[in-house]
Amino acid sequence: MSGSFWKFGQDYSIESPVSKILNSAFIKINKDQDDDVPTGTCEENIADDEDNSSHDYAASEDNVVNENEEKEEENTLPTTESEYENYRPNLDVLDDLLDDDELYTELMCSNFKLLIFLKYPEVLSKLIEYVTNEKILDEETDSAKKPEIIEGVNDHPILIERDRKDKKEDAEEGGDSEETTNDSDHDSGDERSVDSEETSITLPPESEEQVETRRARIAAEILSADVWPISAAIMQNKDLLGRLWSILDHPAPLPIPASTYFMKINERLLDMDITGMLEFILSRDSLVARFLTHVDNPSLMDFLLKVISTDKPDSPTGVIKILKSQELIPKLLDHLNPEYGISTQSAAGDFIKAFVTLSTNSSNELASGIGPNELTRQLVSEEMIEKLIKIMLKGGTSLSNGVGIIIELIRKNNSDYDFIQLVYTTLESHPPTDRDPIHLIHLVKLFAKHMPDFADMLDKTKLPLMEMPFGNIEPLGFERFKICELIAELLHCSNMTLLNEPNGEMIAQERDIERAKELETSTEKENITFIVDNKSSYYDKDCVEKDITENLGALQINNQGSEEDELNDTGVSSVKLDVKSDAKVVEGLENDASGVELYDETLSDTESVRECLREKPLVGDRLKIALEDTKILISILDMFTEFPWNNFLHNVIFDIAQQIFNGPLKTGYNRFLLKDYLVDAYLTKKIVDADKACQDYEKKTGLRYGYMGHLTLVAEEISKFKEYIDEMKLTFCNTAVSDRLEEPFWKEYSETILADTREKYNTVLGDFGNDQESDDDVIRNSDSEDIIGDTEGNENYGNGENDELLSNGHDSGNMDLYYNFNNNENEENEEDYAEYSDVDNKNYYNNVETNDDDYDSDDGKSKSAESEFTDKISEHRDGNSLYNEDNDENGSDKWTSGTSLFPPDHFPSRSQPSDPKLQDQNIFHHQFDFEGVGDDDDYMDPNDDGQSYARPGNPLYTTPKTPPRPKTILFNSLSALDNNGEDEEVALGTSVDDRMDNEISSDEEDSEDEDEENDMGNEEGYSLYRSRSKEAF
């Protein structure tokens, strides 16, 4: 036992250290004060008596007293939970329990006394005190600080010794042995000293801070353990939860260990009792402010996201209403300002993006999503978007985080993927709710308004040159890249169907007004059981009223007295009428402008159409108009060649170009962006010049510019666009676009450079084209010529009976049977294989041949697959040719010569047809005749499932009767491979294997006896004899 790694004793009756500690962990309430003295006091009294007696007597007396007390305490402790009501916990043993390594293991093993002890409120309070200790909360990342080391500690190693029980057992065993000599004692002492040296390690003593940190970690593990009694005991004492949540009141930054403990414990309680936990959380004052104090703490913000995720559409919990009433979204946007640190800005932006992802509008995006809600609706409101844009225009990290939020909003709330399209709904059929999909009308309109500001930022941003191995270049910079990315995403958003519907904005505004009224009514009537302090409103009505006032301009709001929370019905009605009338005007203008080209092949891109669209633009067209006015798309396109090594920028520019060339041509303002790209920006000329510049640069440096891949993609988009308008026979009223596409230099580039590049892109990777034919191709061509040559002298060719046969005889399946022969031989040489013998032999497995490559070729006993193949060809070249003229005279025998592709011991024969007349039919005629295909082979397949029986007239299960096999192994048709076969016959004819001759002769004798039996069976029409395995063929 001394050298074993097992630290537990073999005696299962021995108590664990935790159980021993728990024996003194309970104090009976009705006991006298003397009996209530803890174990530590008794030990002190015993220690005082040691001064008046000898050390040995005192030590033995102490052991006896402790053992008696432990036995007595063990016998007196109750065995049921109800009986522990008369006991109180002994908190003095809690530190000993936390210091024991087996505490958590005992807890997960449901130690009864341990669970009873930990359920006491006093014990739980002590554990929470460990977690919320000021030393833990004030812990700084000062890992460089070393604990104070007592002098002389490092001079003496600390020995990790065996358990005291093991030492005691070893001592008892040593006492029982009477024949032990002094030498043996000396040897055992040396062995123990060696063990001590091997297991010794020098460790500095733990400081007080380290001890408290370790105990806090164990306390957090206990409180967050998946043990229902402990979690239930915590939930029954709200004061304990209040002390735990006091961690949030600690000033930032909060140490990561403390926040991790907080998250683990609360997540466990939330999973166990979601109703009780949410009731407690929502009753906290200033919940949002307390969390945002630690916004850069990932553990706390992750827990807040989990709390939000409990408010689902089918089971609302009121969390979203509370967070909105406490202005979560505005306060988060405030943290994006440059006044805060970069880490705080990034943390706030990441939280908003995670919340948008959680509230995605796509039903199949996240199974645990909560869908659109009032928080995301507030985020895309006019006030919040205006606030976000102003923060983004400050540049730096604020711009980067803002662009990320906008991109996430657009991608997760695409109205084209709504289950029910908004334009096909009415207030009666689909009454608005707080879970309706959100629209991005305000977002697009406000970014169109501030587009000149972003264009100025894009043009004015300049960065110092950066030194690179190939020269000094100007870096693009994060701000310019983010603006380009923002423009591409806004262009995606402007193509949404809702934003290009004449009535889309009107319908959305109507639903917003109705939703505000309904939420106001429900707020007055609803009584949420979770909320204790509801002084603040659940819905920010002032924000909604401001949006409606600014957008519609006709809504009268009464902000006095009791009418503060009500909307003026008369104002709403007038607003609806005005919006409807405006929508009719817009629709009429659109029809007037584009009604001609709806069913016409001429695309109206005249100035009159442009002015009509600009006068009353739709939401999507408003953004495109802003892009055209600011010329920001052309500026971004010019950056393509200005930053030839930034592939991120090139990908964004290609995305923009792809949207423009694939956008609508007959409706909307996209056709004018297309004109700007091709005419004003002269995109075709830019592509040709960029390609020429790359060629010149390659000649000088041997390098190609990094934009060439995306340059080809943009050129392909133009090429596809030209093919589309040619195929659809579309023409532009303004011929400038067509003229650009018909210019000679562009045609030359498209037909030469672009075509060659397209061909290279479409080539299979690694397929460079083989100039020389392979050996297999030569064999295939020879066989094909052989068949064609034989058919010229075939009398039966062309009579209709054999035409189909010859056309199908040279199929890929039969030819591959031969072409893969060499490969099969090589595969068989790579591993051992077993040959099957005839049934007459008692042994199914004749012999096992090892790999020929394992032996030396000089022994003469083994040959390679290639030499055998050559010998077999040479021996039987003059045997029976596949297309012999003699065989042509007798059509029925032409395809039934007894040749075989494989040696007879490897593969079985196939069964004869049930009807002898079927033998002459072409369906059974194969290009290659196989040796041993007749019924004379009695091979039994051990893998046969017993279900493959011959069926009459079925070509898949029957084969024609074949005559006895001649002495040939391989195809007779291989004579066509070489016209000078006679010269090779003399050289190769004498190299036939003797073993093959013996096997063939024995097979011929067996075939004569079995042919008569098979013929008798075939005379009756069909038989149920089992067919041979077809897997070999």
Curated annotation (Swiss-Prot):
Name recorded for this polypeptide: SIT4-associating protein SAP190
Family designation: Belongs to the SAPS family.
Chain intervals with Acidic residues compositional bias: 171-182, 784-793, 828-838, 932-944, 1000-1018
This protein's UniProt keywords: Cell cycle, Cytoplasm, Phosphoprotein
Biased composition (Polar residues): 909-924
Positions where Phosphoserine occurs in the chain: S774, S857, S862, S892, S991
InterPro entries named among the record's database cross-references: SAPS (IPR007587)
Gene: SAP190
GO molecular function: protein phosphatase binding; protein phosphatase regulator activity
Function: Positive regulator of protein phosphatase SIT4. Involved in the general amino acid control (GAAC) response regulated by TOR. Involved in the dephosphorylation of the elongator complex subunit IKI3.
Posttranslational modification: Hyperphosphorylated in the absence of SIT4.
Residue segments, region Disordered: 32-82, 147-213, 768-813, 828-1033
Modified residues (Phosphothreonine): T990
This protein's GO CC annotations: cytosol; nucleus
Subcellular location: Cytoplasm
